[in-house]
Amino acid sequence: MITMKVKNFIYLPFCLFIGTSVAGALPEIPEPFKYGVGGIENGKIYIGLGSLGNNWYMIDTNQSEKKWTKIAQWPTVPREQATATIIDGKIYVFGGIGKDTSGVITLQKDVYSYDIAKDKWEKLMTRPPVSLAGHVSFIHNGHAVSTGGVNENIFNGYFSDVELSKGNSALTEKVNRDYFSKPADDYFLNNHIISYDPSKNQWKNLGTTPFPGTAGSSVIFAEQQIYILGGERKPGLRSVRSWTGELSHDRIKWSELPPVASPEGVSGAYASVIDGNIFLAGGAYFPGAAEKYSNGEYWSHKGLDKAYSKEIYQLIKNDWKKVGSLPEGLAYGVSLPWQGGMLILGGEKKDGKAVSDVIYLKKNDKQIKIVK
C-alpha cells in the first residue's frame, strides 16, 4: 500500500481528512477527463466522451486488482455536456454538443446505446423531443428522465454566427454582444421534463418544472426524491437555487430548498448521497457576476475570471451547511455513488486543464474522509 502524509482540517460540525491512500481507493483515470459522462452498475464504473474524445473506459471495483480498461470506442461525433444512464445492461447516451462535419459546434440530437455484455454501440431510431445539452438525467422505474439544458436554436445560432464572423473582429464583437447581453429568460433554457422508455423506444411528457430551466445543474435521485442543485441561469451567470421534487406515478410535487453556494451559485458541481445525506461539492462560477447582473449588466461575466469552488456542502435539516473542502477547486467531472460515499471522477481545475484524479468522499459518524 502507498502511504502519504495526511493533512487535517477542522470544519464544524465535522472533521475533514485529506489523504492519498486508503483501502478501496481507485487508480487515476488513464487520460485527463472533463465534460464527459459516467455511470455505475454492479460495481463496474463506465466513463467516456468529453475530453476523452471517442474513448470509453471501465473499471471493475469488485476485483482485488482494480484497473481501467478500454471498451468499444464511441462510434460517432465526440461530444461534451451529454448525459448517460444505465438501464437493464445498456448505457444510454443523450444529447450533448460537438462539431459537425463542417467543424461548427452544434447540439447533437442522436441517441446511442452501449450493450455491456456485447461491448457494442448502437444508434437508436429516436430523437429527444426537446434539445438536450447541459441537461441532467436520472433513472426512474426503468426510464431515463431528463430536464434542463440549452435552447437548440439559440445555441446553434450563436456558434454558427461565430464561425461566419471569423476574420472580422468587429462582427465577432457584435455577435458576442448580441448573444451575451440578454436577461436570463431570453435564453429559453429547457424546463420540460421528459422520460424515455427504452423497452418501447418512446418518449413521454412529464410536464415542466415550476422554475426556469438551467444548464450545468447537479442532480441526485434517491428514494423517489429528485434534487436539482444550482446550475447556470444564462451564460456566465450561476444560480443559487435548489429544488427537490417527489416523484410518484409520473407526477412530481416540487418544493424549493434554501439557496446553496451563495451569493454566486455554481455550475458543474459534484453531487451525490453519502450515508443517506445530500452533498454538493466543487463547481465553477464568476465572482462578481451576480452583482453586475442585478445592476442591469446582462453580460455579467465580461472581464471576470472564472473561479473553481473547493467547498463541500451538506443538506442538514433543510439547510445547507459547509462541512469541508476538496483538495482544490474542481468542476465539470462526473460524480457517482459508491460504497456509501461519493466518487469524483476527473474535472477541470483553475488553469482550465482536465485532471485524471479520482477522489472518494466518505462519511463515518461525524467525519468526512476525502481520499485522493
UniProtKB/Swiss-Prot annotation:
GO terms for cellular component: periplasmic space. The keyword Isomerase applies. Pfam families: NANM (PF24996). Residues 1-25 form the signal peptide. Kelch repeats lie at residues 44-88, 90-141, 143-177, 178-223, 226-269, 291-340, 342-371. It is found in: Periplasm. The active site is at E232. Its main location: periplasm. GO terms for molecular function: racemase and epimerase activity, acting on carbohydrates and derivatives. Coiled coil: none annotated. Keywords: Carbohydrate metabolism, Isomerase, Kelch repeat, Periplasm, Repeat, Signal. Transmembrane segments: none annotated. It comes from the Bacteria. It catalyses: N-acetyl-alpha-neuraminate = N-acetyl-beta-neuraminate. Its EC number is 5.1.3.24. Belongs to the NanM family. Converts alpha-N-acetylneuranimic acid (Neu5Ac) to the beta-anomer, accelerating the equilibrium between the alpha- and beta-anomers. Probably facilitates sialidase-negative bacteria to compete successfully for limited amounts of extracellular Neu5Ac, which is likely taken up in the beta-anomer. In addition, the rapid removal of sialic acid from solution might be advantageous to the bacterium to damp down host responses. Homodimer. HAMAP family: NanM. This is N-acetylneuraminate epimerase 1. It comes from Escherichia coli O6:H1 (strain CFT073 / ATCC 700928 / UPEC).
